Amino acid sequence: MIVAAALIVSISLWFANRRKAAQREARYQIVLAKYAGDLKPGMNRGQVERYLQTNGAQFRQMCCVANFRGKYVSLKGAGWDDLVKIAEESAPFFCSENNVYIAFEFNPKSQGELSDTNSSDALKSVSIFHELEGCL
């Protein structure tokens, strides 16, 4: 009887957590739709970053978001991508943060420059990006 009650409670908690996760993901999709509607592939980095700054969105840059998704992208000549943080989720015990970003992935326009970014880099895609940070 106790085992059955514990099982019912565990299953109920699992379904509640799944429902909350689905609600969070729906909110992320709304934010993504806004950015993707305003910022189209092919726009240059200068236009994208001006839009973000004008709309008060703080962003940071990170190399090669695609590599974190399991897609291989050569680091040689790779451009940096812009990330706008939209949420924080519970982190597993071995990480200090579990952040959710809108990722703006760019194709670098020019190769071999010293700069990591170029205002003429072309926007390749806009997507949701989850990143565990501060992990052991």
Regions found by a protein language model. Give the residues of each.
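Hydrophobic membrane-insertion alpha-helices, especially the h-region
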Residues: 1-14
